[in-house]
């Protein structure tokens, strides 16, 4: 696809026009069936509760599709954090890859969500952690119990227990390994002991992953966000990229339109290399977080021109590894402090402009739920995953309780109920920025040319 040229002058003019009390109507939003979309990241647990148990669920998310889509904010892609059965609140330790966590609903609820998204022109991508499973996954339980049953000195065999081949076991203690209680065996668990690392060199594991991809793609999922790509083979970037190349090829063999975006939490020169795998997108950490390009420009610690020159430079860098790359700019996510805390004494102006800078970058732009309200949340992870701030009313239908270990704190800006009718609110500014992006397809699909 030939990209159009988008100048920094046009970008700045769009930011300024977003300050006016005007916005494109739904009828002017342009829908193009490609992956240069405008995505909204949802942590289902904290988003919207449909049954009053205090935990967000798929039915709750479905009830808010008009808020997310063209009738509301204008997003046309949703990325959900993992929705699979898991013993944790965050659900990155998967116990079953082909089902829905009961806290979130059922497979029938998921099918309904996909259908309702499709009706609205919204595609859905799932967060898929393939680096590790839960220690409660039947694969690991079987392998662990097998090793416990071995006589002292006996050699294990995948012929006796095929799941022994699914994980990385060792008789010797190593960094990043955990002891199997009552044995001299250890298993790789780079994150925590409850997340044993999969053996991604195993053909059996690869066959399982292929079946998982097919299961969800046939249910209407448009793609996947791949967690922790640098950890596929810890310390071996070449092998990690080789595995990602295999995974990308398999996904597109099942569904040529499958979209994949990888989390490669590293410096820009390193994560750019992962485009060699052929993957569609890699998250653009260079512009994200409190020390990223967006926050530095808005805080005035670097010249405003850096925004355009850095985009121009990185577009050339990424294209040198994959000419068909689609950038994945984001500003914050579930692992980062929320952006409202980046700016001292901010009346909302900096929060607004920073959000627009993210939304006016090329590729598929990602916005974390609640950023459109200027929600707060920093420190421990649970605080960064606070309940969506629909209302100040504790009896509001759909309001979630949030993670049990999160601190209780006041928000910096009002709830959605109090912002939606204020034309100068953070919410309405975000809404305008999303709609400008959708109304001008060249923003997502163009090359940046920094002009003096």
Where are the regions that the model predicts?
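Glycan-recognition surfaces
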Residues: 249-341, 360, 382, 387-408
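Loop/helix patches that line or flank the sugar-binding groove of alpha-linked glycan CAZymes
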Residues: 266, 330-333, 344-452
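Short, polar loop/linker segments at the starts of domains and inter-domain junctions
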Residues: 50-65, 343-348, 398-404
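Acidic/aromatic-lined carbohydrate-recognition and catalytic surfaces
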Residues: 19-210, 218, 225, 229-277
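A short acidic-Thr-Gly-centered motif at the start of a beta-strand
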Residues: 114-117, 318-320, 357-361, 452
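Short, basic, glycine/proline-bearing loop/turn elements
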Residues: 49-50, 95-99, 331, 335-343
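Non-transmembrane alpha-helical segments in soluble domains
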Residues: 62-69, 114, 210-217, 248, ...
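Sec-dependent N-terminal signal peptides of Gram-positive bacterial secreted proteins and lipoproteins
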Residues: 4-21
């Amino acid at each position: 696809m030939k990209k159009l040229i988008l100048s920094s002058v046009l970008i700045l003019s769009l930011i300024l026009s977003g300050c006016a009390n005007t916005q494109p109507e739904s009828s002017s939003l342009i829908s193009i069936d490609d992956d240069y979309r405008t995505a909204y990241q949802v942590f289902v647990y904290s988003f919207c509760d449909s049954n009053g148990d205090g935990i967000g669920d798929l039915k709750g998310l479905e009830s808010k599709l008009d808020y997310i889509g063209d009738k509301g904010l204008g997003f046309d892609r949703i990325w959900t954090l993992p929705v699979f059965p898991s013993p944790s609140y965050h659900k990155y330790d998967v116990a079953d890859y082909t089902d829905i966590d009961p806290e979130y609903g059922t497979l029938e609820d998921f099918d309904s969500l996909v259908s309702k998204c499709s009706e609205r022109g919204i595609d859905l991508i799932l967060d898929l952690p393939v680096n590790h499973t839960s220690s409660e996954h039947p694969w690991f339980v079987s392998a662990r119990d097998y090793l416990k049953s071995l006589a002292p000195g006996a050699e294990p065999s995948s012929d006796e227990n095929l799941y022994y081949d699914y994980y990385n076991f060792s008789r010797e203690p190593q960094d990043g390994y955990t002891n199997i209680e009552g044995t001299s065996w250890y298993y790789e668990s780079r994150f925590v002991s409850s997340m044993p690392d999969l053996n991604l060199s195993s053909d059996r594991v690869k066959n399982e992953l292929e079946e998982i991809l097919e299961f969800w793609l046939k249910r209407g999922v448009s793609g996947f966000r791949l967690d922790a790509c640098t950890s596929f083979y810890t310390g071996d970037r070449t092998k990690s990229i080789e595995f990602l190349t295999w995974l990308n090829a398999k996904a597109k063999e099942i569904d040529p339109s499958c979209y994949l975006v990888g989390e490669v939490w590293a410096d820009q020169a390193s994560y750019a290399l992962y485009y060699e795998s052929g993957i569609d997108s890699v998250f653009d950490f260079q512009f994200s977080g409190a020390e990223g390009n967006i926050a530095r420009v808005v805080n005035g610690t670097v010249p405003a021109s850096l925004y355009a020159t850095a985009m121009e430079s990185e577009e050339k860098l990424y294209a040198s590894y994959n000419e068909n790359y689609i950038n994945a700019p984001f500003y914050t996510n579930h692992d980062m402090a929320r952006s409202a805390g980046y700016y001292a004494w901010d009346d909302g102006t900096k929060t607004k402009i920073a959000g627009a800078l993210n939304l006016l970058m090329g590729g598929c732009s990602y916005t974390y739920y609640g950023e459109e309200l200027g929600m707060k949340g920093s420190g421990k992870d649970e605080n960064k995953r606070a309940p969506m701030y629909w209302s100040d009313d504790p009896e509001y239908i759909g309001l979630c309780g949030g993670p049990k270990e999160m601190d209780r704190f006041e928000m910096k800006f009002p709830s959605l109920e109090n912002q939606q009718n204020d034309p100068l609110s953070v919410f309405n500014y975000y809404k305008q920025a999303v709609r400008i992006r959708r109304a001008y397809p060249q923003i997502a699909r163009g090359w940046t040319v920094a002009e003096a």
